[in-house]
Every structure is written in C-alpha cells, then in structure tokens.
C-alpha cells in the first residue's frame, strides 16, 4: 500500500527523500506530478513542455521511455516503455524500483535480473542472457533494480542483489528517460495514508436508535499498483483497465442489538428496592471479520502461488436436492498480494482490533438504566466497524474487508 507525495515537494526539500515510509512495513511512496512541477518543466513561456527527465525521483503517474542513442547521440537505437514503481519498505533516496513493462508481449510484467551462476556454458561461457520479465513477487530481490544517474543527465541500472545483473536495456550506461504519456485522467490522486487523529476521534454518535448503520468517515487512503491485485484477465488488459487501485479505510457504527420499552410511563416501581439497579441486557452474535467481492459475501483463501496471493471468492449458497450449482451471477475471484493483506491487518491491530480466535463472538453485557433514562422508549447497542475498500480506477468496488471491534461498543437511548 502506497501513499502519494508531489514531485515539487521532493524538488524543494531533498532531505525528505531519505525519510522512511510513514506507514511502516509493506508500504511505500508514489511520486505524482503536480501543477507546480508541471510549470517548472515548461519553457518558451509555457508553450512547450520538457519530456526529458534528468533527475530522480521518477514520477509514477506517467509512462516513461528508456531511450538508447547511437554514438552520435542523434539517432534512437532502442526504446522501451516502462513504469517505475518504488520498491516497498525503501526510502525514495534508495532509488530502488520495480521496472514494469508498459508495452509489447511482456506488458504488465516486471524485469528480472540474471544471476552470475546462470552464465551460459558450452560455446559462450561468458555470455549472460536477459531473463524474461515475470509477474511481480515482492519477495524476489532479483526484481528490484537501483537506478543511478550517469553524467548528470542520463542513467543506468544496477541489481540490488550482489550476484545479479539487470536486463541489458537497463544495464547499459547512458540511457535517457523521456515522458511517454500521462496516466490522466486515471492517474493517482492525493492519498496521505492513515489519519491517526481523525481515526481516534471516531464517527459522530448523534443519530436515532432506528439507525442500523451510521454515516461513514474515511480515515485513511492509499493506492495499490496493479501488480499487487489479480483479476480474471491478462496482466496486459488489467494494466490498461486500472494501473492503480484506490484503497480507503472507513469507520462507522453498526447496530448489533436493539429493544423497546413498552412500559415507558409505568417503569418506575415504587416498591422496588433502591439498591437493585435496573439494566438492559445486551446479547448478540457479532461476526468479527467479513469479506465481500463486488458486494457479495466472500471467503478469503490462504496465501498461495507466485507472489503469495490471497484469493477472495464469493460464497455460493447451498444446493437443494438434485440442484446443480449455479454459476450465473457469481463474480470472478479477486486476488490480493500478501503485502496488501498484511498491511491491512497491521493497520487494524494498531487500532485495537484483536486478530485470531473465533470468527463469531458472543457479546453479552448489562447496560445500567440511569435515573435520567427511566422513561426510555428505545435502546440500541452499536459496535465500531472499520472497513477497507479496494476500487478500480473506474470506481468499481472490487473487494471490501470489514473488521468489527467487539471491544468498542456504545449505547444509544431514546
């Protein structure tokens, strides 16, 4: 999960490049081009825009071209269109990136560094061939490349792994970087991560007992590059459909129990012992964690396959006698990388949610009836709910992960 920061901010304050991600493990920072940075990149009184990139960090809201020139510097010998995504858990000053192919047969896949041990044998023992790009696996250090400046205005790539060698188009020194195209209008917007102060404030509680669910408040916002999400389509098509997914964390109150007092005008018993406290007994079964795919209940699978994905699959209802399982109306499963799932869980645990244990918890408590509430008519008990929502660039809600804090209850009287 990534927060976003503006390019102009890093140009003004170079020291901020060395700052660790404020979000903790399994997180990173995306650099987006703002109006101020775009103005700086113009000349001829704003009539023309510079396409050549000469400094780091690299923006993530644009497809970039890695351009190799001939010895004269006038003719292009090769051009690769790529997307540079900062490596997780690294400051931007490390200049470590996942290099994603944005065009051709490997579109959507990430460059892989070759290993010295993989040098050819037989006739050409000293030749190290480029490895084919593969889907991203954040655990694979050979898919991380460090970009270095060369002679101020050009670049070259180097493997982070000691025995690794990047693909030739990155390894060769002196290539230029040019802006190919912007991702507008589906480029990442401002996403500042978790707002701890707003989260601790909790949603307003001034609503009637008839309210089943209060209005929600967004307390966190991130972006997730498409390599960490799997849909039922090719990487090439997925990259074209949604290069970045928006993740939000919302808070709201949800009613788990309510009752009415039918004897509101006759509830004071003159013969009642003053030492005996009247209470409302709350009894409710609460599902602590629930998942949804496109609005339908889903189950989360275990980590599996290349990249360590958890698959969220819609729950299909039970079949009747002799009835075939219906496929109609069931959406395709959605996969989330383990880094996204673990980051969400850490955010929850930092907010007081306790993982593990039973999925369904029995809530039982006695709520005392104060003297000022002796004429109450309706009572409701609410649990604090925090919900992660993952949306495509077109706004479609793909996955929703709901966490109920059974230790954060509030009661409402009327």
What spans do the regions from the language model cover?
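Membrane-permeabilization and membrane-interfacing ectodomains
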Residues: 208-414
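Lectin-like carbohydrate-binding module/patch detector with strong preference for beta-trefoil
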Residues: 2-227
């Amino acid at each position: 999960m990534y927060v976003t920061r503006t390019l102009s901010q890093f140009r003004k304050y170079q020291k901020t490049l060395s700052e660790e991600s404020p979000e903790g493990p399994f997180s990173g920072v995306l650099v987006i081009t703002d109006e101020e940075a775009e103005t700086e990149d113009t000349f001829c009184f704003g009539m023309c825009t510079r396409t050549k990139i000469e400094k780091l960090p690299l923006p993530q809201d644009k497809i970039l071209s890695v351009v190799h020139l001939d010895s004269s510097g006038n003719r292009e010998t090769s051009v690769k269109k790529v997307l540079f995504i900062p490596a997780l858990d690294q400051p931007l000053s490390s200049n470590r990136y996942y290099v994603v192919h944005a065009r051709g047969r490997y579109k959507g896949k990430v460059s892989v560094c070759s290993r010295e041990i993989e040098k050819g044998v037989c006739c050409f023992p000293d030749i190290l061939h480029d490895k084919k790009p593969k889907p991203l696996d954040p655990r694979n250090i050979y898919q991380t490349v460090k970009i270095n400046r060369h002679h101020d205005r050009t670049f070259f790539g180097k493997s982070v792994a000691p025995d690794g060698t990047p693909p030739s188009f990155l390894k060769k020194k002196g290539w230029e970087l040019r802006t190919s195209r912007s991702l507008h209008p589906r480029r990442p917007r401002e996403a500042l991560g978790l707002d701890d102060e707003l989260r601790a404030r909790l949603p307003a509680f001034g609503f009637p007992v008839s309210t089943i669910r209060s209005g929600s408040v967004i307390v966190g916002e991130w972006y997730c590059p498409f390599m960490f999400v799997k849909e039922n389509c090719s990487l090439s098509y997925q990259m074209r459909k949604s290069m970045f997914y928006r993740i939000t964390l919302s808070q709201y109150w949800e009613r788990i129990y309510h009752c009415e007092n039918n004897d509101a005008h006759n509830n004071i018993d003159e013969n009642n012992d003053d030492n005996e406290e009247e209470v409302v007994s709350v009894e409710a079964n609460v599902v602590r964690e629930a998942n949804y795919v496109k609005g339908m209940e889903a189950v989360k699978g275990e980590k599996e396959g290349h990249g360590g994905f958890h698959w969220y699959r819609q729950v299909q209802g039970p079949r009747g006698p002799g009835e075939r399982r219906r496929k109609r109306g069931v959406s395709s499963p959605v996969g989330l990388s383990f880094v996204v799932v673990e980051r969400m869980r850490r955010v929850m645990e930092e907010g007081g949610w306790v993982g593990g244990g039973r999925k369904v918890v029995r809530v039982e408590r006695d709520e005392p009836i104060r003297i000022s509430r002796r004429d109450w008519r309706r009572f409701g008990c609410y649990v604090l709910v925090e919900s992660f929502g993952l949306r495509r660039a077109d706004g479609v809600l793909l996955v929703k992960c709901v966490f109920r804090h059974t230790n954060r209850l509030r009661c409402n009287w009327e």
